[in-house]
């Protein structure tokens, strides 16, 4: 039975939505003070930095946050919602690409898939980077505990991933208050540091950032790449738009998250001006010794919440890609009876866990992992800007000069960050790029293979109208019950129906042809979900439409429509086709490799009976070969 999800967003307490947003939206960017400024100082020269270098780094971080997060995401991109949902794939569907010229359509689609793959790849690195940076606080408390850092990080990550299948609905209500405590602590520590060296506030002047780049031309890319770590969580603001909406996210950012982050960065900068040796870990050195242990626990909790948000975001992104036909079906379990956003994708969770732990064991320290971190998000931000600019040009009615001015500003910043992160490739940046490349290859292989299967079905089966009108089936054996056939190509006869008629000479008293369509929007209302067409006395065609964020449960949606026409849905059987993919015997071209990858994915994909929620006891699968 389908779960009934409530989307009531009324809140009994003032600012409850904003506090909730702190726990869901700002986990990634909220934990960046653990490592961002430290990596910037190391990029400049470690303990050999000058006071002006610190002010320059603070200037770059400050204006990166203002321009890349506040202006780009909060003021602009968050306005581009698809029925309330955000994220790269939501932006792709919002563009309605079938209206684009063929060449532009593929460019925009490629940008969207690239960005989605980059964000999924980032899901491997972000939990590792965040938790490892938090646990490294042990080294500040006691250098003798250094050898426990990797072990404890792995244990925390194991706990995070193994708990995913249980769902987080019961404890999610604590995420917001914990993150409120975290941001409050960031701000308080920042003020404490600034009071020790108020001159650090000169770093608000953008000229210090420019001078830093001019004084270190050979390190400009490395420095900018390190400063980018302060804004890597910006994409999450858009991805989580559907949870809270733009006004709530904007208020939480402008009045809580951003002030706390800036205060903490400047507090760390002040400590560095007072004690250059604090470069070993300026975040923990900012804290008075008596609060080190509580801060360690709070930082670990914050990074666990940040990791949870990233994992949930990857699950959501994967579900969108599955429903839009870019990833093979995987079993998706809903872990909440009230919120359709709470899902668990088992196979993906295990893959993420193994990859994440492997990253920790391979890099062992956040300083080394920072060399790989950020490049995937930088490219994802570029693709978001490209798609957003296309949407503004197409649908917002802005004059061309305004669009060009905005495009120039956004892309200048994004390409600067992307170019700076390219310097990380040889030090580990190849890892997220390789993960993203593998994901893109899987997406393309699945999509191409799926199109090939549909093309063969269209080629070798007759139009449904023609099949229904045939007179040569009057002597077939009639089964006195209703059969429901699922069709992938709506206007064509389902292969299962065609094979039963041609090979078994069987026809049913009533045949219901059901096509499931995924709309280019996150949700389809109940009244728009079902369309029934009576073809003749023995055939009924039903088109079911779902949004790409909705649970697909065919019996629960189809049942009332059949009952209204005198058909007992509980007495009907479901007949579905199951393709046995046969790839080429020899691999001589790239398309042959794609065919073999698709065949592997198809063998391991979730079966239709599970994906569509069909009753196993009343479902018949008819297999047939499809040679690619």
UniProtKB/Swiss-Prot annotation:
Record InterPro entries: K+_transporter, K_trans_C, K_trans_N, Kup
Transmembrane segments: 15-35, 49-69, 106-126, 141-161, 174-194, 210-230, 254-274, 295-315, 343-363, 369-389, 398-418, 425-445
Job of this protein: Transport of potassium into the cell. Likely operates as a K(+):H(+) symporter.
A GO CC term assigned to this protein in UniProt: plasma membrane
Identification of the protein by name: Probable potassium transport system protein Kup
Subcellular location(s) per record: Cell inner membrane
Keyword list, A-Z: Cell inner membrane, Cell membrane, Ion transport, Membrane, Potassium, Potassium transport, Symport, Transmembrane, Transmembrane helix, Transport
Topological type in the membrane: Multi-pass membrane protein
Annotated catalysed reactions: K(+)(in) + H(+)(in) = K(+)(out) + H(+)(out)
Keyword Transmembrane helix included in the entry's annotation: yes
Similarity comment: family membership: Belongs to the HAK/KUP transporter (TC 2.A.72) family.
Major location (coarse): membrane
């Amino acid at each position: 039975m389908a779960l009934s999800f409530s989307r009531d967003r009324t809140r009994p307490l003032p600012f409850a939505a904003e506090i909730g947003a702190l726990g869901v939206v700002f986990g990634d960017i909220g934990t960046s003070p653990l490592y961002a400024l430290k990596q910037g100082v190391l990029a400049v020269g470690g303990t050999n930095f000058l006071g002006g270098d610190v002010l320059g780094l603070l200037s770059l971080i400050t204006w990166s946050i203002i321009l890349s997060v506040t202006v780009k995401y909060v003021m602009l991109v968050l306005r581009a919602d698809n029925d309330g949902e955000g994220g790269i794939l939501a932006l792709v569907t919002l563009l309605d690409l079938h209206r684009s010229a063929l060449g532009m359509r593929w460019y925009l689609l490629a940008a969207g898939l690239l960005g989605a793959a980059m964000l999924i790849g980032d899901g491997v690195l972000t939990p590792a980077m965040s938790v490892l940076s938090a646990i490294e606080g042990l080294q500040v408390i006691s250098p003798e505990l250094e050898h426990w850092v990797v072990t404890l990080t792995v244990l925390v990550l194991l706990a995070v991933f193994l708990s995913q299948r249980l769902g987080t609905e019961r404890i999610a209500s604590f995420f917001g208050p914990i993150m409120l405590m975290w941001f409050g602590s960031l701000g308080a520590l920042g003020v404490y540091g600034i009071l020790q060296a108020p001159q650090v506030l000169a770093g608000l002047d953008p000229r210090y950032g420019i001078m830093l780049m001019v004084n270190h031309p050979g390190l400009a890319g490395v420095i900018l790449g390190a400063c980018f770590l302060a804004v890597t969580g910006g994409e999450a603001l858009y991805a989580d738009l559907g949870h809270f909406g733009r006004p709530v996210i904007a208020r939480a950012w402008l009045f809580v998250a951003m002030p706390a982050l800036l205060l903490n960065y400047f507090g760390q900068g002040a400590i560095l001006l007072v004690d250059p040796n604090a470069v070993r870990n300026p975040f923990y050195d900012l804290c008075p010794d008596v609060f080190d242990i509580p801060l360690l626990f709070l930082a670990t909790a914050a990074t666990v919440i940040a990791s949870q948000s990233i994992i949930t975001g990857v699950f959501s992104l994967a579900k969108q890609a599955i429903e839009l036909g870019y990833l093979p079906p995987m079993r998706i379990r809903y872990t909440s009876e009230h919120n359709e956003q709470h899902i668990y994708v088992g196979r993906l969770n295990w893959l993420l866990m193994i990859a994440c732990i492997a990253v920790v064991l391979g890099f062992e320290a956040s300083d080394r992992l920072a060399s790989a971190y950020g490049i995937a998000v930088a490219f994802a931000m570029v693709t978001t800007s490209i798609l957003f600019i296309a949407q503004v040009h197409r649908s917002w009615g802005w004059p061309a000069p305004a669009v060009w001015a905005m495009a120039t500003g956004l892309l200048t910043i994004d390409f600067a960050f992307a170019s700076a992160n390219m310097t990380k490739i040889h030090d580990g940046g190849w890892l997220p790029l390789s993960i993203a490349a593998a994901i893109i290859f899987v997406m393309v292989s699945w999509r191409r293979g799926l199109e090939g299967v549909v093309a063969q079905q269209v080629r070798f089966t007759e139009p449904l109208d023609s099949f229904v009108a045939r007179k040569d089936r009057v002597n077939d054996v009639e089964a006195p019950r209703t059969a429901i056939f699922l069709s992938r190509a709506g206007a064509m006869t389902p292969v299962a129906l065609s094979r039963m008629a041609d090979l078994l000479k069987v026809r049913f008293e009533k045949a219901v042809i059901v096509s499931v369509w995924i709309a280019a929007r996150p949700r389809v209302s109940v009244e728009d979900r079902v369309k029934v067409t009576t073809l003749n006395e023995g055939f009924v065609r039903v088109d079911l439409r779902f949004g790409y964020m909705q649970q697909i449960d065919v019996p629960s949606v189809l049942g009332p429509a059949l009952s209204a026409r005198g058909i007992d849905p509980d007495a009907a059987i479901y007949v579905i086709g199951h393709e046995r993919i046969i790839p080429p015997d020899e691999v001589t071209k790239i398309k042959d490799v794609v065919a073999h990858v698709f065949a592997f994915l198809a063998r391991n994909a979730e079966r239709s009976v599970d994906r569509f929620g069909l009753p196993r006891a009343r479902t018949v699968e008819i297999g047939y070969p499809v040679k690619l």
